[in-house]
UniProtKB/Swiss-Prot annotation:
Belongs to the FIS1 family. It comes from Candida glabrata (strain ATCC 2001 / BCRC 20586 / JCM 3761 / NBRC 0622 / NRRL Y-65 / CBS 138) (Yeast). This is Mitochondrial fission 1 protein. The chain crosses the membrane at residues 131-150. Keywords: Membrane, Mitochondrion, Mitochondrion outer membrane, Transmembrane, Transmembrane helix. The keyword Nucleus does not apply. Its main location: mitochondrion.
């Protein structure tokens, strides 16, 4: 049986908490000593920040989770999942892939991990195709302009 099968979906990350809810999570962390607060309080706050619509909040959430990952061996798998979601939301797809690949190695049969991995890989593929289309379009545009000027010179 998989160790983590109770995780939120990627779509959950796009349902922001109300400002008052984030304030409560922040106040809990501050009351417990900020960086010295319990792992659970900081984790909850980080997830609340990742769910935020503010990119700065999302980045702070990812940073907090990264710190938790480094210091709490017991929470590493969970952190990897949430870090994947956070990086995906920040459009840092290569980092998201790195995290989800590491998690997938540890839990190759976890359906939530597999689904998240597929979403990350699909997004990377889509972004790659968009990038290639833009480069191709730029080349065609430049070639057209060059051809136009070459014809005018004659």
């Amino acid at each position: 049986m998989s160790k983590i099968n109770f995780l939120p979906t990627l779509q959950d990350a796009y349902e922001p908490l109300m400002a008052a809810q984030i304030d409560i999570l922040r106040e809990q962390v501050v009351a417990e000593g900020g960086d010295k607060a319990s792992v659970q309080s900081r984790f909850n706050y980080a997830w609340g920040l990742i769910k935020s619509e503010s990119v700065d909040d999302q980045r702070l959430g990812v940073k907090i989770l990264t710190d938790i990952y480094k210091e709490s061996y017991q929470r590493r798998r969970e952190c990897l999942y949430y870090l994947t979601v956070g990086c995906y939301k920040l459009k840092e797809y290569s980092m998201a892939k790195r995290y989800v690949d590491t998690l997938h190695e540890a839990e190759p049969n976890n359906k939530q991990v597999i689904a998240l991995k597929e979403m990350v890989e699909d997004k990377i593929q889509t972004e790659t195709i968009k990038g290639l289309a833009m480069v191709t379009g730029a080349i065609v545009g430049i070639a057209s302009i060059a051809g136009y000027y070459m014809r005018r010179r004659k």
